[in-house]
Swiss-Prot record:
This is Phytochrome E. It comes from Ipomoea nil. Regulatory photoreceptor which exists in two forms that are reversibly interconvertible by light: the Pr form that absorbs maximally in the red region of the spectrum and the Pfr form that absorbs maximally in the far-red region. Photoconversion of Pr to Pfr induces an array of morphogenic responses, whereas reconversion of Pfr to Pr cancels the induction of those responses. Pfr controls the expression of a number of nuclear genes including those encoding the small subunit of ribulose-bisphosphate carboxylase, chlorophyll A/B binding protein, protochlorophyllide reductase, rRNA, etc. Residues 213-383 form the GAF domain. One of its GO terms (molecular function) is protein homodimerization activity. Keywords: Chromophore, Photoreceptor protein, Receptor, Repeat, Sensory transduction, Transcription, Transcription regulation. Contains one covalently linked phytochromobilin chromophore. Belongs to the phytochrome family. GO terms for biological process: detection of visible light; red, far-red light phototransduction; regulation of DNA-templated transcription.
Length: 1115
């Protein structure tokens, strides 16, 4: 499908190229706008803002672009509320400084320098006190210099305190010096921690919000930012896909004009500025009317100093003019950056405005940045949820449209509800089929639709479709006649001459001005840089354009296009009748089978889940109990089913908790992260319990009525045991912290200032850092982020949230956390934080408990070496046995060939075929042993040959007949005749091997005597892929009773280097073979029976242009 205008292509690479092209075009517009502003200022002429925005050029000269970027990044000016030094590393020699250094550092009160350039070349440390020099030297020597900001320093001359904010540039280090209010370092630290605590409180508010409402999330964050900073106005700006912006949330002083709903052109926040926001995520302007201070630098430097990350960087005159026009003197802007799996995206900005000069200290700005990082994480999750909900809605609509097509193709999608208009957001839609039109909503006339179809066939005949937000830009000559009602269009070709259309009106129709009602109609000076001018300019820019088509919408259209093509195959020109009822019944049967398969798959997922899952009906009787909860409690599913959860299984301490959870869930209110206690059964002491953190979810039937409650849990018993022991010590925690016992987990403690106060022996072993190295250092930044490197900013943000929540006394959830130890090894852990209190109950910090995901024990390596030796000896024995087995097997095969000539009946022929299949199975096993086999993960040959399922089943059953008779078990089978004789392509012997292994395990663990074993083979849907036709076949092997031991199933699923039994080895390798054949194996436990489910897809035709055999790598 082709795309024009502002639309997005299907290809990710094409999308990337298109986005890059948009960014370059926007850079051109920004550069030209800036150049015109500079020219107007130099000439004294007025700057016509609206005209410059509307007539932005597509290209500018290289000189204009260079000047633009240099002006933004290397402007040579700073704001006057602080001063700046640039130094060489590591000599501290000054290579640049701001002119106001003399005033702020008190240098004029000392020896007056003979000339203003006298600071160049001197050692910057000599300007500060001895303690300040040591702090600066320590920071400069750090690998991650920014994590230590701010540094507390004092001027040597006037003893004034400063926040020193350091960052590296191409020629050295820039030191921004911001005056501090207090001269006491302790108050500085306390103020910083208090700011972080306020931020954590705000973050807790964000995290407690119900999901699915981005608007509420934005409204909450602007309220919290205003409480933290005290600005008159706080807004959330969102950047749209075409780079234009919108105010989506606002809180303001009551007498200020509202800006909520304002849209502004992309040039209002230039691309270069957006790039800077990704680098320096908090930007403060204290006073837009203040005269900027010049930066002087060493003459040897080839270009002006880079001020990209400077907290003092002066704003461009264009921006200060804009601020002054809107009555905003001071501002604080914070970037909302989303770190997706693909890239780092600037989603928008949180912007604070004040009507008088305002300075926010660095620690408070850092707390705001911390809040923004948490907001970005929460926002990203909400965006993902919104995307999933949108996709779900599209899939539901597609399902309904498909159902209509089955009954009334192709007209049901335009004559019934829902229609194609409900698939994507649009103002109108049309079906053009067999020269006729069906129109819905706001569309061109029937004649115009036909004209568009002819234009598409003539100009885009080789395309399957087209999408654009501007038909004029796409080249359609009749676009002016359509007016504003139809600006954007998406099409999908469903046959060689037939189309589906979706239409959108121009963007201005969708945009609502959020300010005073008269503003859009004001006749004032549109050339002034002002939000109203921005809005008017935006409306002019998007004139004749619709909202762009999103990727998900294009994908939905493309999916419907494919469905329509399939449904229209075979429909003649005069086909107008509904699809007959037998076909409808077939489709109902298919849907019923699909729903049944989905239900079975869900049961298997729950059963094999690695977390405890259990459920009750509305009366509190247990009706679900998976393998994990059975393992934790010692209560098997067949015993647990039918018991009362509260009376029979729950510890008395959790009776009321479960009653409340069930009561709320049965009313449709679900709870998360609730701690409960369950009893242990079996050989455990009577007082032992299992600690779980559970989520309570409502269970509903097909009518959506609530019929019970499902609990999904997480086992926290090990952590609880350590925590309980710690609590019992009542403050005397030395026994744990100082213990060398390897069973004690890694523990460290934080004081109320987020500095490390404890670091036990297990932490030393885990990180390689000894206690004396870390005590007193800040945990976020200095230790985790500096000494122990992290993978990214998000990891530090999540750790800071957890740490400050613990310090603030809030409950914390287990956090997945990772860092690099001293040797550079990456360590994966779970971490929890719990508050520390003194004897009066006052919070004095928190304890952090780490649980490693994988612990390496030195003694295991020695044991592995011994095991390797034993394996080598065993392999030699195998080699001897393999060779000795081949000789008698060849004799049996020769005798078998002789018997073939004496066969007189069909039964005898079948016996010989079964015998031959078993012989081939033995030979295949020996050959696999020769080549290393799947035990070592080497290559195993999967052959492709024609065979019938009936022969495989005969061979498999023959291998278990003797055990069946010995145990007096009855063999039941349900195999349709058409499946028995169905010719398919695959590796018959490998299939025979795995089925016989699974069936033999079923027989071994079936209760006897008078038990039974059942084998059932069920066909599924046919699939067409890469020109090959596949059929899905499911093998079910069932027996009554409690089933195979859990340890055996664990061996089968997980494998590893140590198995519980030899049977576990066999099952693991068999399931490995099934996976190599692109199949799946599940073991399902029900109340009265258990069974293996083996799902495989087989080709029903000889493979096209493929080798008859291929090598497949074992997982």
């Amino acid at each position: 499908m082709e795309n024009y205008g502002k639309a997005v292509t299907f290809s990710s690479s094409a999308t990337s190229n298109l986005n890059t092209g948009k960014a370059i075009a926007q850079y051109n517009a920004d550069a030209k706008l800036m150049a015109e502003f500079e020219q107007s200022r130099e000439s004294g002429k007025s700057f016509d803002y609206s005209r410059s925005v509307i007539h932005a050029p597509q290209n500018v000269t290289e000189e204009e672009m260079t000047a633009y970027l240099s002006r933004i990044q290397r402007g040579g000016l700073i704001q006057p509320f602080g001063c700046m030094l640039a130094i060489e590393e590591p000599s501290f020699k000054i290579v640049g400084f701001s002119e106001n250094c003399f005033d702020l550092l008190g240098l004029k009160s000392g020896v007056e320098p003979p000339e203003r350039m006298s600071l160049i070349g001197i050692d910057a440390r000599t300007l500060f006190t001895l303690s300040s020099r040591a702090s600066l030297a320590k920071a400069v020597a750090s690998r991650e210099i920014s994590l230590l900001n701010p540094i507390w320093v004092h001027s040597k001359i006037n003893q004034k305190p400063f926040y020193a904010v350091l960052h590296r540039i191409d020629v050295g280090i820039v030191i921004d010096l911001e005056p501090a209010n207090s001269a006491d370092p302790a108050l500085l630290l306390a103020g910083a921690v208090q700011s972080q605590k306020l931020a954590v409180r705000a973050i807790s508010r964000l995290q407690s919000l119900p999901g699915g409402d981005i608007g509420t999330l934005c409204d909450t964050v602007v309220e919290d930012v205003q409480k933290l900073t005290g600005y008159d106005r706080v807004m959330v700006y969102k950047f749209h896909d075409d780079s234009h912006g919108e105010v989506v949330s606002e809180i303001r002083r009551s007498d200020l004009e509202p800006y909520l709903g304002l849209h502004y052109p992309a040039t209002d926040i230039p691309q270069a500025a957006r790039f800077l926001f990704k680098q320096n995520r908090v930007r403060m302007i204290c006073d837009c009317n203040a005269q900027p201070v010049k930066v002087l630098q060493c003459e040897e430097l080839k270009q002006p100093l880079c001020l990209v990350n400077s907290t003092l960087r002066s704003p461009h005159g264009c921006h200060t003019k804009y601020m002054a026009n809107m009555g905003s003197i001071a501002s604080l802007v914070m970037a909302v950056v989303i770190n997706s799996s693909e890239s780092m995206k600037l989603w928008g900005l949180v912007v604070c405005h004040h009507t008088s000069p305002r300075y926010v200290p660095f620690p408070l700005r850092y707390a705001c940045e911390f809040l923004m990082q948490a907001f970005s994480l929460q926002l990203y999750m909400e965006l993902q949820l919104a995307s999933q909900l949108a996709e779900k809605k599209i899939l539901q609509t597609q399902t309904l449209l498909c159902d209509m097509l089955l009954r009334d193709a192709p007209f049901g999608i335009v004559t019934q509800t829902p229609s194609i208009m409900d698939l994507v957001r649009c103002d109108g839609a049309a079906l053009y089929y067999n020269g006729k039109c069906w129109l819905l909503g706001v569309t061109p006339t029937e004649t115009q639709v036909k004209d568009i179809a002819e234009w598409l066939l003539h100009n885009h005949g080789d395309s399957t479709g087209l999408s654009t937000d501007c038909l004029s830009d796409a080249g359609y000559p009749g676009a002016p006649l359509l007016g504003d009602a139809v600006s954007g269009m998406a099409t999908a070709r469903i046959t060689s001459k037939d189309f589906l259309f979706w239409f959108r009106s121009h963007t201005a129709k969708e945009v609502k001005w959020g300010g005073a009602k008269h503003h859009p109609e004001d006749k004032d000076d549109g050339g002034r840089m002002h939000p109203r001018s921005s809005f008017i300019a935006f409306l002019e820019v998007v004139k004749s354009r619709s909202l762009p088509w999103e990727d998900s919408e294009i994908n939905a259209i493309h999916s419907l296009q494919l469905i329509m093509r399939d449904s229209l195959q075979g429909i003649g020109e005069n086909y107008m009748k509904s699809v007959s009822s037998p076909q409808q019944n077939d489709s109902d049967g298919v849907r019923f089978y699909e729903l049944s398969s989905m239900a079975l798959e869900l049961v298997r997922l729950v059963e094999t889940a690695t977390v405890p899952i259990f459920g009750v009906d509305s009366s509190g009787l247990i009706n679900g109990w998976n393998a994990k909860i059975a393992e934790l409690t010692g209560l098997q599913a067949n015993v647990a089913i039918g018991k009362y959860l509260i009376d029979d299984v729950t510890h008395e301490d959790s009776h009321e908790t479960f009653k409340a959870l069930m009561c709320r869930a049965l009313q449709g209110e679900e709870d998360r992260n609730v701690e409960v206690k369950l009893l242990k059964f079996g050989n455990h002491p009577t007082k032992e319990v299992v600690y779980l953190v559970v989520n309570a979810c409502t269970s509903r039937d097909y009518k959506n009525d609530i019929i019970g409650v499902c609990f999904v849990g997480q086992d926290i018993t090990p952590e609880k045991a350590v925590m309980d022991k710690f609590v019992r010590l009542q403050g005397d925690y030395e026994a744990i912290i100082q213990s060398l016992n390897p069973l004690i987990p890694p523990i460290f403690a934080s004081d109320e200032n987020a500095c490390c106060s404890e670091w036990n022996a297990a932490m030393e072993r885990l990180t390689g850092l000894v206690k004396c190295e870390v005590i007193g250092k800040r945990l976020p930044g200095e230790i985790f982020g500096g000494l122990c490197r992290l993978k990214g900013q998000d990891a530090l943000t999540k750790f800071m949230i957890l740490l400050y929540q613990g310090i603030s006394g809030h409950d914390t959830e287990k956090l997945s956390f990772g860092f690099f130890d001293r040797k550079g090894n990456f360590i994966d852990v779970f971490i929890t934080a719990n508050k520390r209190t003194d004897e009066r109950g006052n919070i004095i910090g928190c304890f952090c408990f780490l649980q490693t995901m994988a612990v390496d024990h030195p003694q295991i390596s020695a044991r592995d070496i011994e095991d390797d030796r034993e394996c080598l000896s065993t392999l030699k024995e195998f080699a001897y046995i393999q060779q000795q087995m081949k000789n008698p097997l060849n004799g049996i095969r020769f005798t078998h060939k002789l018997l073939e000539g004496t066969v007189t009946s069909d039964h005898q022929k079948q016996f010989l075929e079964t015998s031959e299949a078993c012989e081939k199975q033995i030979l295949s096993i020996i050959e696999n042993m020769d080549s290393g086999g799947i035990v070592d993960g080497n290559r195993v040959e999967l052959k492709t040959e024609e065979f019938v399922i009936g022969n495989v089943i005969d061979a498999v059953v023959s291998q278990v007949m003797i055990p069946l008779k010995e145990k007096n078990l009855q063999l039941l089978h349900d195999i349709p005749d058409q499946i028995k004789s169905l010719p398919i392509y695959g590796d018959q012997i490998k299939l025979q091997l795995v089925l016989s292994d699974f069936l033999l395990s079923i027989v071994r663990h079936a209760p006897s005597p008078d038990g039974w074993v059942e084998i059932r083979v069920s066909p599924g849907l046919k699939l067409i892929q890469d020109g090959n036709v596949f059929i899905h076949i499911q093998f079910r092997m069932t027996h009554p009773g409690q089933g195979l031991p859990s340890a055996l199933i664990e061996d089968m699923v997980r494998g590893g280097t140590r198995w519980t039994t030899q049977e576990g080895v066999v099952l693991h390798l068999s399931q490995k073979l099934v996976r190599m054949m692109n199949g799946h194996v599940h073991y399902v436990r029900e109340q009265q029976k258990c069974y293996f489910l083996i799902d495989l897809d087989f080709k029903t035709q000889k493979p096209r242009s493929r080798e008859s055999s291929m090598d497949t790598k074992a997982d």
